[in-house]
């Protein structure tokens, strides 16, 4: 297992003071515990992110960035882990070491996390961290999304009172039309986390269950005991803008790779 080591740095993002530590070879952010409303505020019965419910989260650490190709290569080189590179998928979508690793199934992401002494975040931890102390907002920064905010595919014309409209891919900072962007290419949220919307979707610990919010406990929920798919959050470089919303849920089979040119991950760690 990779040795954990810690260097403490304090930053300020917006109104939040952020504590960053270097652990397991990568930067992590201390996410202070608290209570939040999880789910879609305008959701309806039958939606997988309905009903909105109160959730209490203990403090934890979360990776500042998505795990990169370079970091995953180091894991493979040091452990000899048997990994299928997926021919063109990784190199076409994430061509350089500073891009997020893709084509990783849930078990491979878990193996990497365990090697670093960490774990995957729970779904509740992920949404709490993505919101970055903002209440009732759609994205980690607010209710409006532009090409200066994240790496994603496109808008649709049929949106809502916020006036989102169609946009070509190359308007704004997002210049990556059919690939990931280097991690940290866009502004962080208030916790100092980068790419919590777009770039790559991120694995969570939990099994996915469509109606789990109806039975979820309040304190540190960890998802159902069993399932067929694992939770994937955050949207990705080929998502339309609604897929990037902090409350948007999804699930994918944990052991297959056919969809995973858009799938990555980041790690979490308990506060001890």
Task: Enumerate the language-model features and the residues they cover.
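A short glycine-rich, aromatic-capped structural motif
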Residues: 21-86, 104-107, 198
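Non-catalytic surface loops within mature trypsin-like serine protease
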Residues: 40, 59, 68, 143, ...
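Short, P/G- and charge-enriched loop/turn segments at secondary-structure junctions
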Residues: 17-18, 43-52, 169, 250-256
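Bacterial Sec-dependent signal peptides at the C-terminal "C-region" and cleavage site
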Residues: 11-19
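Sec-dependent N-terminal signal peptides
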Residues: 4-12
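Functional-site microenvironments in short loops/helix caps that host divalent-cation chemistry
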Residues: 37, 41-42, 82, 87-253, ...
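Short, structured beta-strand segments at or near domain termini in extracellular proteins/domains
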Residues: 259-272
């Amino acid at each position: 297992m990779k040795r954990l080591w810690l260097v403490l740095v304090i930053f300020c993002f917006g109104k939040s003071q952020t504590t960053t530590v270097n652990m397991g070879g990568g930067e992590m952010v201390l996410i202070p515990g608290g209570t939040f409303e999880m789910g879609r505020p305008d959701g309806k019965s039958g939606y997988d992110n309905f009903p909105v419910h109160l959730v209490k989260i203990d403090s934890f650490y979360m990776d500042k960035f998505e795990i990169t190709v370079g970091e995953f290569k180091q894991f493979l080189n040091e452990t000899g882990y048997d990994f299928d590179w997926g021919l063109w998928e990784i190199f076409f979508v994430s061509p350089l070491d500073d891009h997020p690793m893709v084509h990783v199934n849930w078990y491979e992401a878990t193996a990497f996390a365990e090697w670093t002494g960490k774990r995957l975040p729970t779904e509740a931890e992920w949404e709490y961290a993505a919101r970055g102390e903002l209440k009732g907002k759609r994205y980690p920064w607010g209710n409006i999304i532009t090409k200066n905010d994240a790496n994603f595919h496109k808008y649709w014309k049929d949106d809502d009172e916020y006036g989102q409209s169609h946009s070509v891919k190359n308007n704004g900072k997002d210049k990556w039309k059919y690939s990931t962007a280097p991690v940290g290419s866009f502004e962080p949220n208030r916790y100092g986390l980068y790419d919590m919307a777009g770039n790559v979707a991120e694995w969570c610990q939990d099994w996915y269950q469509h109606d789990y919010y109806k039975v979820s406990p309040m304190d540190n929920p960890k998802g159902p005991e069993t399932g067929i798919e694992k939770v994937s959050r955050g949207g990705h470089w080929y998502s339309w803008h609604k897929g990037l919303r902090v409350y948007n849920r999804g699930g994918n089979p944990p052991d297959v790779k056919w969809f995973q040119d858009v799938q990555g991950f980041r790690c979490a760690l308990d506060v001890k």
